[in-house]
C-alpha cells in the first residue's frame, strides 16, 4: 500500500501533525488489513526557492501494475514506491490516458513532459502511427522505454524518446502532430532547465509553441495540477478551447477542489 501525505503547514504544531498522520495511517491500515511492512509512505513538502526534489533511495525495486486501455485490454507499467518522490504512474490521469488512446489510431502523437511515458504507451496500444515522448530526464525516458517493452511494443523508429528542454526542442522542431499531450509540472527549477518553469506564468508561450506543431484538424490535451491555475484569455480567444476537467477526474479523485484541470484545445 502506498500512503501519501502532504507536509503540514507551519501553523500546525509538529506534535499535532504527527498525531494526525499516525491516526490516519492506522485507520487506513485497519480498513484495508495491511501490515506495516507492506506500507510505503511518501510525504510531499512545498518546494521553495532553489530547493530541488532529489532521489530518495536506491532500492531499484519495481512492481508491475496495470490499468484498462481504450480497447478493454490492459496496459502494464513499472512503479517504484521508495526511490522517488512519485511512483512513475499518476493515477489521477488514467481517464486522460484513455481519451488519448481513443483518439490515436493511425495518428502521430506528441507527449511533452512525458515523465515515464505512460500516456505514450496508451497511444501506442491505441494504434498510433508514431509516438514521440519528450522529457528533460533521460532516466524517466529510460523508464518509459521499459514500459514500452513491458507492453510488447517494439523498439522501432516510430517510437522516439527525446531527452531535452521542452521549450528548446519545440522551438526547433518542424514536425506536425495529430495529437499532443502536455501535462507540465507546476514549477521546476531543474539544473538541466534553462531558468525556471512556472505553469501559470509560462503556459501561454508553451501552448502557443505546441499549437504551431499541431496539425490543422488535430487536438492538444493540456492538463496541470496547480489548483489555483487560470487559463489565460489569450488561449481562449486564439483557439477553440473545451474544458474537460469534469470528464477526466475519476470518482476516487472527485473532491471539492479538483486535483487538476484539463482542456482540449483545437485550431479555430
Residues covered by each model-derived region:
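Mobile active-site "lid"/loop adjacent to the S-adenosyl-L-methionine
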Residues: 140, 163, 179-209
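S-adenosyl-L-methionine
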Residues: 136-181
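Conserved SAM-binding loop of SAM-dependent methyltransferases across substrates and taxa
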Residues: 116-129
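Non-catalytic substrate-recognition/targeting regions of SAM-dependent transferases
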Residues: 17-90, 98
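Conserved SAM-binding motif I beta-strand of class I
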Residues: 130-135
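C-terminal catalytic and target-recognition region of SAM-dependent MTase-like enzymes
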Residues: 205, 219-268
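Conserved class I S-adenosyl-L-methionine
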Residues: 106-115
Amino acid at each position: 500500500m502506498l500512503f501519501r501525505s502532504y507536509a503540514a503547514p507551519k501553523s500546525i504544531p509538529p506534535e499535532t501533525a504527527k498525531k494526525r498522520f499516525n491516526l490516519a495511517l492506522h485507520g487506513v491500515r485497519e480498513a484495508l488489513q495491511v501490515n506495516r511492512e507492506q506500507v510505503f509512505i511518501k510525504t510531499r513538502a512545498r518546494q521553495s526557492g532553489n530547493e530541488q526534489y532529489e532521489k530518495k533511495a536506491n532500492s531499484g525495486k519495481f512492481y508491475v501494475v496495470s490499468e484498462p486501455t481504450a480497447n478493454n485490454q490492459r496496459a502494464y507499467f513499472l512503479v517504484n514506491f521508495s526511490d522517488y518522490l512519485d511512483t512513475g504512474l499518476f493515477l489521477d490521469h488514467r481517464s486522460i490516458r484513455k481519451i488519448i488512446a481513443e483518439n490515436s489510431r493511425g495518428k502521430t502523437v506528441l507527449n511533452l513532459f512525458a515523465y515515464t511515458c505512460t500516456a505514450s504507451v496508451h497511444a501506442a496500444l491505441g494504434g498510433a502511427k508514431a509516438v514521440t515522448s519528450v522529457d528533460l530526464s533521460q532516466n524517466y525516458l529510460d523508464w518509459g522505454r521499459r514500459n514500452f517493452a513491458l507492453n510488447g511494443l517494439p523498439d522501432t523508429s516510430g517510437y522516439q524518446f527525446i531527452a531535452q528542454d521542452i521549450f528548446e526542442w519545440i522551438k526547433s522542431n518542424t514536425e506536425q502532430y495529430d495529437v499532443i499531450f502536455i501535462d507540465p509540472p507546476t514549477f521546476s527549477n531543474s539544473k538541466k532547465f534553462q531558468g525556471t518553469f512556472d505553469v501559470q506564468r509560462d503556459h501561454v508561450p508553451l501552448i502557443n509553441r505546441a499549437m504551431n506543431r499541431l496539425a490543422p484538424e488535430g487536438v492538444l490535451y493540456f492538463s496541470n495540477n496547480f489548483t489555483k491555475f487560470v487559463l489565460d484569455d489569450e488561449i481562449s480567444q486564439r483557439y477553440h478551447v473545451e474544458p474537460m476537467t469534469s470528464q477526466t477526474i475519476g470518482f476516487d479523485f472527485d473532491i471539492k477542489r479538483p486535483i487538476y484541470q484539463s482542456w482540449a484545445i483545437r485550431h479555430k
